[in-house]
Every structure is written in structure tokens, then in C-alpha cells.
Amino acid sequence: MVRLAVIGANAPLILFYRRAKALGYYVIGIAWAEGAVCKQYCDKFYPISFKEKDEVLRVCREEKIDGITSFSLESALPTVVYVAQAMGLVSNTEECIRLTETKFAQRQTFEKNGIPTPEYHLIQSKEELNDMSANYPVIVKPVDSGGSQGITKVEVPEGIEAAYSVAVECSRSGRVIVEEFIDGREFSVEALSHNGKHYILQITDKVTSGAPHFIEMQHHQPADITLEQANCIKETVEKALTALKIENSPSHTEIKLNSRGELYIIEIGARMGGDYISSDLVRLSTGYDMVKGAIELATGRFAIPCIQESHYAGVYFYSSLAPRIGNVIRDHAKHPEIVEYEIDDAPLVEAKSNADRNGYFLYQSDNGKMVL
């Protein structure tokens, strides 16, 4: 049986753990004990912080693992690469970690390689904030957090200090990046990279709440774009993945396309996409199991992806921003397109990040995007 080590075991990883077990892998979970809800899907579980790299490496050597991953947990990627490199397993390199670990590092790399990216300022103190010269509106965000945490759109200079304070609270390093605001449509791109060759699997339409926090509310595949736009997106993303040295891993790229047709890379994670995009939507829309592909990649059993199906698929999230989704979920029997759902009938809380949700449903259709 192929032995797979998974770093991290919190709730967002449950879908990936379930799939790994369903595929017949021997799963070894390594994570903090607190919040390790994925423990039930492990053949073995070690309550070790992924920050203890040498201890994680010791366990992985003892377990004679065939591959290691953190699925969509970006903060664990340095440990994944550390262990894989020490054991001669498939992974990205330490240089890739250095280039991708912060939004600022990515901006610098894109700029150096002629890849379209918003103008930006790294802010490490209030003094630097006060000295900054920027064209408004801007986006203020932590350099090193995800899930829409700490992100604020600022229209005028008078709002910059409050947005900075919010971003600093969510930043592990206390650093903030202030970026040019790019108005336009949002997309994500899911890909697998093997030995430096990139395989684009799907392009996703993203619907957010907009300003001020840009919370993700819906995702739909395939994106409603022209063939020319799709080719431009694929070409730009492949160039960006190469620049960031993403050579042996899944990736999740966020991009924006403005009204003039100009494409900008917002950020790239050298990991699976969350929000059911990689775990479910790619499979529902293309027939290709991205989780299976990512595990095969990590364990040295990669096969070139073969896309043989074409369907429409998507996810709607139930939150204070979209309360009517709760009624759709409750009446799911009236909607044959719905293939999976979950609902929590606790009172809705004010949505300030992607974590503030009370449910979701997934759909698959051969008759176009499911419109409510």
C-alpha cells in the first residue's frame, strides 16, 4: 500500500483526506492535536506541529513514506518541501518556497520576469505607511495570510490607517502590502506541474462580495470567457508558474481581467485550491480527479492528465451575504443539479472573511451555469 504523509489536519482538509482514503492510500496525518478533525481519516496520526521540521522528518523516515503533501494548507509547504528534499521524494524546491511564501516576494518575481502584476508597496511600519505615495483606490492586505482575511479596499487616503491596522492583525510577520486596485472579473486557474511542465486543468469564474473585504461567494466552471481569453490566461499562468519555480506540485492561481482586456496575476499558491474548487469542481466539470492526480504526483506515480468530459459545475455559499442560499439548500429536492450540500441552521453572523459561512451546495449541469 502506498504511504502518504499529510501535513495538517484541520477542517478545510477533510475533503482531501476522505478522497485519499477512498483511493486506498495509507494516510499518515501529522498536525497539532487541537482542531485535528481529520484524525478520523488517518491510518496513523502524530500530534506534532509542522513547525518542528526535524521531528516531522524523523516520523516520515520511520514510516517509510512514499510521498508527502499538505493539500491546500499553504503554511505547511516549507515543511513538505524540507521533508521531501531530505528523503528524495517529489516536491518543489526551497527556492520555490522563497519565491512564493509572501505576496511581496511574488510581486517582485512577476515584475522581474515581465509578468503583469498590480503596482505595490511593502509596508512594515506606520511610518512607511505615512510616507507612501499611491494612486487610490488601493487594496490593503497582509503579505502572508489567506482566506480573504485582513483585506480591505480603500478609496481615499483617509481610510488607509484603519485598513492597515486590520491587515497587520492578520499578518504573521506584521508586514502589509498595499496594491493598485484592479477593477474587473476574477478567475482562478487550477494546474498540476510535473518536472517543470504545467498542465492547466480548469479556469474558474469567481464571484465575490466586492469591497471592502472581497469574500468569495460563488465559483463556477468552466469560466465564461472566449477562447482567446482562455489562451491568454493559460499562457500567462504558465509563465508565472515557471518564474516562481513551481515544478512539482498542484497550484491555484488567482487572476483579474479588467475592462480593457488586460490580465493581472494577483497571487499563486503552490498547493490545491480550497472552497471545493480542486477537491470537487474540477472533477465535476472535467471528469479529472485533481486530488488523485496531486497524490500520484507527490508519490512519484504521475500520469499526464486526460480531460475527457465537459460539464458545468459550481458552488454557492450560504452566509449573511447570500441568505437566500439557505432556502435553496432546504429545497434541494427541487433542484436536480445539486449533487452535494451542507447547512448549519445557527444564526448567520456578519461575514468578514471566507470562514463566516453556514453552508454550501455543489451543482453539476449539462445545460449551463445554475442561475438562481
How would you label these PLM feature ranges?
Residues 1-95, 302-303, 311, 320, ...:
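ATP-binding N-terminal substructure of ATP-dependent carboxylate-amine bond-forming enzymes
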Residues 13, 112, 129, 293-372:
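Peripheral (often C-terminal) accessory segments that flank ATP-dependent C-N-forming ligase machineries
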Residues 66, 174, 242:
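Short acidic/polar active-site loop segments enriched in Thr and Asp
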Residues 100-177, 183, 194-196, 223-235, ...:
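Active-site nucleotide/adenylate-binding loops and adjacent lid/helix of ATP-dependent enzymes
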Residues 138, 199, 264-267:
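Protein kinase-like catalytic core scaffold
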Residues 158, 180-246, 250, 257, ...:
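ATP-dependent carboxylate/phosphate-activation module, predominantly the ATP-grasp catalytic core
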Residues 177, 248-253, 304-309:
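Flexible, glycine/charged-enriched surface loops at secondary-structure junctions
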